[in-house]
From Swiss-Prot:
Glyoxylate binds at residues 165, 255, 258. This is Glycolate oxidase 2. Binds 1 FMN per subunit. The gene is GLO2. Signal peptide: none annotated. Homotetramer. FMN binds at residues 78-80, 107, 128-130, 156, 231, 253, 286-290, 309-310. SUPFAM superfamilies: FMN-linked oxidoreductases. The record marks 109 as: Involved in determining the substrate specificity of glycolate oxidase. Belongs to the FMN-dependent alpha-hydroxy acid dehydrogenase family. The active site is at 255 (proton acceptor). It comes from Oryza sativa subsp. indica. One of its GO terms (biological process) is symbiont entry into host cell.
Amino acid sequence: MALVTNVCEYEELAKHKLPKMVYDFYAVDAEDQWTLRENSEAFSRILFQPVVLVDVSCIDMSMSVLGYNISMPIMIAPTALHKLAHPEGELATARAAAAAETIMTLSSWSSCSIEEVNLAGPGVRFFQLSIYKDRNLVQQLIQRAEKAGYKAIVLTVDAPWLGRREADVKNRFTLPQNVMLKIFEGLDQGKIDETNGSGLAAYVASQIDRSFSWKDIKWLQTVTSLPVLVKGIITAQDTRIAIEYGAAGIIMSNHGGRQLDYLPATISCLEEVVREANGRVPVFIDSGFRRGTDVFKALALGASGVFIGRPVLFSLAIDGEAGVRNALRMLRDELEITMALSGCTSVKEITRGHVVTESDRIRRCSRL
């Protein structure tokens, strides 16, 4: 295998290695895929404003998330069905996250169980939760996560319906026999209807409670003592409401473009959300992060940390646990270099003054 020098190269390699149906499931987004492109392009409109002649002989990227110390502000977002990428699936991902001393978020659409991932080894892990019609199932999942030592619930709020991912329809996406949705283990997966071209999506969507609303977050807090991070927010209004309903944190996300197309890039909405949160809760962010420079820009605009998704899946597909370790290492190295060249020796030293946004440039021009 050729030397991989950045995480984007893993995606290109995975495109040639994975079955088309699997690659498209991971890579292709909703409808016109405008948001997918914008998630990446928005970073190119944010420029650096470095500070020079600073002693950067020692760079400290460590930080604390909900009281847990991690080595860097880069964490693993919840993504589905890792065994489609590699036989060890989420177990390999969990080991790589632990080796990097960072947080892994296990998807409730995982191909390994909550307990199996816990047994993969030590590490700080969060559990992503969708709200299903069967509240007993939801409560059981939470109890299992608590018993297994997961440290927080990541509640997905932007997917009451699944986005229309046309590639899955064309490919008639279904699960191979050796991969299953572990949260549905014991249920009749023969119920998955293959006739509509996207059997998995149709079956899982049918289990999601489309009536779920803000008041149900209060119910969730009655069945768990774990902090609840609300994932899928991109506006100040929803940030305010989430905090009012007791969210322990916000994870800004547009689902990587997989849900509603023509959403703005999360990085473009970050300052609005951070201003509304006003330090009351941490604001994390995902969607489109592919470089350490992207991470730096988010931190400069007020994010408390960044979650990555697809780079994990594609690096896992190419080289298993070692691939995910390498992807995390490359992002860490890129962030370290960016911090040093910007004059920052710790995450806390990264400030708004280190970047210039498109809005900044417009304001400057208007004063001329």
